[in-house]
Design a protein with these regions (language model features):
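A conserved helix-loop-strand patch within extracytoplasmic ligand-binding domains
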Residues: 80-153
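Second-shell loop/turn segments in exported
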Residues: 10-14, 58, 129-137, 170-175
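Ligand-binding pocket segment of bilobal, Venus flytrap-like solute-binding proteins
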Residues: 154-186
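Early extracytoplasmic/lumenal segment of secretory-pathway proteins
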Residues: 2-82, 92-93
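Extracytoplasmic/secreted envelope proteins and their assembly/folding machinery
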Residues: 21-28, 32, 52-56, 60, ...
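Short, surface-exposed, polar/charged, turn-prone segments marking secondary-structure boundaries
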Residues: 40-45, 72-77, 95-99, 133-136, ...
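Sec/Tat-exported extracytoplasmic proteins
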Residues: 27, 31-39, 63, 72, ...
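Short N-terminal or domain-adjacent regulatory/targeting segments
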Residues: 1-4, 113-115
């Protein structure tokens, strides 16, 4: 909910996809402190989380949101198609990319006994991978794209080698969960 600049309190709603719940709970505390110092206002942040596509549909159908942080460009496009975001928003970003980033984190066993440091390590025969399915999870598509970008840089854009890299990576997948939250508990 918007407030005028003279108000000492402001409330915003962030509609986001499910795995970001804990991230934004922590980030909001940092933002609240920053906003108080910058604008002199106390900010209350309401979080709404669910599947990215469902959240996009909710916003397109009238759920009030000051900020949307969704998993996929197609979900943002659904909001654009409802007239809530300007056409051509992707042109503002390098390579017409999505206006959102995601950090990929490798969770390893305590002490990292297999010394996994980057994507190439996930291709070793002694490594098993647990990841969500990119056909069903927005976060998994970020994983896929991050692996592709790593291989693209490693192989100087040679698509044959990049595809072989991705194929080998997915051959090492032990659990291909339907969603990011499930993959973190597998």
């Amino acid at each position: 909910k918007k407030s005028d600049a003279s108000s000492k309190k402001v409330e915003i709603t962030n509609v986001s996809y499910d795995p970001t719940r804990e991230l934004y709970a922590e980030y909001n505390k940092i933002f609240q402190k920053h906003w108080k110092e910058k604008a002199g206002q106390d900010v209350s942040i309401i979080q709404s989380h669910g599947g990215s596509g469902k959240q996009a549909l909710e916003v397109a159908n009238g759920l009030q949101a000051d900020v949307v942080t969704l998993a996929l460009e197609g979900d943002v496009d659904a909001i654009k198609d409802a007239g809530l975001i300007d056409d051509g928003y992707v042109n503002e970003f390098e390579r017409d990319s999505s206006p959102y980033t995601s950090s990929i984190v490798f969770l390893v066993r305590k002490g990292n006994p297999k010394k996994i440091l980057d994507w190439s390590d996930l291709l070793r025969n002694d490594v098993g991978v647990i990841t969500p399915n990119p056909k069903t999870s927005g976060g998994a598509r970020w994983n896929y794209l991050a692996a592709w970008a790593y291989a693209d840089k490693l192989y100087n854009g040679d698509e044959t080698q990049i595809e072989a890299f991705i194929k080998k990576l997915y051959e090492n997948v032990l659990v291909l969960d339907s969603g990011a939250r499930g993959a973190t508990t597998s």
